[in-house]
Amino acid sequence: MPFVTTDDGVRLYYEEAGTGTPLIFVHEFAGDHRSWEPQIRFFARRYRCIAYSARGYTPSDVPPPGSDYSQERVWQDLRCLMDGLNIAQAHLVGLSMGGFACLHFGLHHGTQGTASRALSLTLAGCGTGSHPAVYEGFKAQSKVLADEIQTLGAQHLANTYGMGPSRLQFKAKDPRGYAEFNARLAEHSALGSALTSRGYQGERPSLYALTEQIAHINVPTLIMTGDEDEPCLEPSLLLKRTIHTAVLAMLPGSGHAINLEEPQWFNQFLAEFLAQVEQGHDFARPVATRPESIWGPSGDPR
């Protein structure tokens, strides 16, 4: 089995297919490297596609309590993966927790020029728990969930978190696909999921506190969200307004795991975006078209 070892000694399992420009997929809290199979099969025809399982997600290592499960560590793991595979630059695609990882990678390596290691960013379903009105509650809920997972196991996670409001659209449209997703969720390491929920989910900073840093990102950025993924709607608009090289795609009648729920739409939007990036399209919005405020008409909610 192929692994890359991070600079703090954690082995990350990865799979790859295809040749060409590297295209790296970063999974959500309820997923793992297998979550990207519909994308790997499609994009491996023209890209070097790589999907990996984050620390805490088998077959990657599950570091014990006291180890580093943090937002900072997660984007560093992505960098270690690239270093281990001798990848200087790549297109980065992340869903939810993976979207946060790609965004934070972009904060350090998302400025065009010789220092940029991100050719583009795709941030899908990114922003749950970020709005100031729900931020503290989300952090508290993440820690409660961590305790429940550690006590009751991953099957409990599948029976509760896997049945959340933004998952029901997937279940209704594609019962077989949803059943596969939920069965895989029940296979997760309870310890790894608990530590991720407590450390990464429960301690990550709000996007609303990072707008000045996010505004420095100037690589092409695709923001995607389902229009029924309520926790991600406002944060997606915030990202669109803040990153001046961003475009926004909203998938109708769709929930959170849009790459699995609507793989054809997801792949179509991503393929068109990547084609424009590789053709040298200028994604920078003219100053005259930019919003007066990144907060929208309701004003700063902080």
Region locations from a protein language model:
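Conserved HGGG/HGGXW glycine-rich cap/lid loop of the alpha/beta-hydrolase fold
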Residues: 6-67
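Flexible "cap/lid" loop of the alpha/beta hydrolase fold
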Residues: 103, 107, 115-152, 156
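Conserved alpha/beta-hydrolase catalytic His-Asp/Glu region
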Residues: 132-137, 151-213
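Gly/Ala-rich beta-loop-alpha elbow adjacent to hydrolase catalytic centers
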Residues: 94, 98, 102
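Conserved alpha/beta-hydrolase "acid-adjacent" motif
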Residues: 230-235
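Short beta-strand/loop motif that positions the catalytic acidic residue
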Residues: 217, 223-225
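Conserved acidic catalytic loop of the alpha/beta-hydrolase fold
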Residues: 72-90
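Catalytic active-site module of serine/aspartate enzymes centered on a nucleophile-bearing elbow/loop
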Residues: 246-302
